[in-house]
Amino acid sequence: MTQSNPLIPALLTDKVAIVTGASRGLGAQIAEQIAAAGARVCVNYLSSEDAADQVVADIIAAGGQAFAYQADVSDLAQMQALAAEVVARYGRIDILVNNALPSYQFNPSADYTSIETVKWAHFSQQLDGIVKGAVNSVQAVLPQMKTQKMGKIINISTNLVYNPVVTYYDYTTAKSALIGLTRNLAAELGQYGIRVNLLAGGLLQTTDASRLTTEEVFDYIATTTPLRQATSVADFANSVLLMASDLSLAITGQSIAVDGGLTMP
């Protein structure tokens, strides 16, 4: 269940957004808050159809517009079909949020937290879902954004790339690659009015992926963060809303930590 925020301003009226991996957790929260700000939203999902339909139902019940679309971000043709459907329904694509993440558990005792036990298969799965997924999604929406001469692309990463409090080798390596991707995209696509930024979240309290995280880890985050609390899913989604809006038109190519000041890169 997402966290409600009745105070979201109408920053995205008449905008059209795609949020990948939006059937639950952070993606669902982002989709709902973007919709609450006035955007029409495509809720992308891989396999959780019922959950995606519920996100859409929640958006519509709150007075927004949305539809769910099944597509694997690691398949370019599927993402191109998704983009075509969005344009057919809504006429444009203004915002892409690259949030999709392969199935993952933030378990500090897992074998992918040590260089001695992590396997290349762990890296491959994360690189395929995170980096390839983001590249495919950008390539799918790019023709429409170039035609419009505007667009916002927001890549979702983690503050673990700056401060590996827990050494999730596979996940952090893939998320680190998004920084380079973000900068290259911003450098090339700025001439078309397309802004590309990255938001690096802390360990969010709480999502499906972080449910195995111990209270000791959350307590450590709270005591070492200037704001003395872990970042909530709703707070992170509000940062996405800011970057998706016209309030951030002068910002591109940036990697911004959204973690209450825990990391200051």
Annotated model-derived regions:
Residues 2-8, 163, 223, 227, ...:
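Short C-terminal tail/terminal secondary-structure segment
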Residues 80, 102-124, 167-170, 210-213:
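Conserved mid-core segment of classical short-chain dehydrogenase/reductases
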Residues 16, 23-24:
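Conserved glycine-rich cofactor-binding loop
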Residues 143, 187-188, 249:
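Alpha-helical segment proximal to the catalytic Tyr-Lys
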Residues 190, 195, 251-253:
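Short, small/polar-rich loop/turn modules that mediate ligand/substrate recognition or access, typified
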Residues 116-135, 150, 154, 178:
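Catalytic Tyr-X3-Lys loop
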Residues 138, 174, 182:
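Active-site helix of classical SDR
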Residues 39-54:
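Conserved glycine-rich Rossmann-like NAD(P)H-binding loop of the short-chain dehydrogenase/reductase
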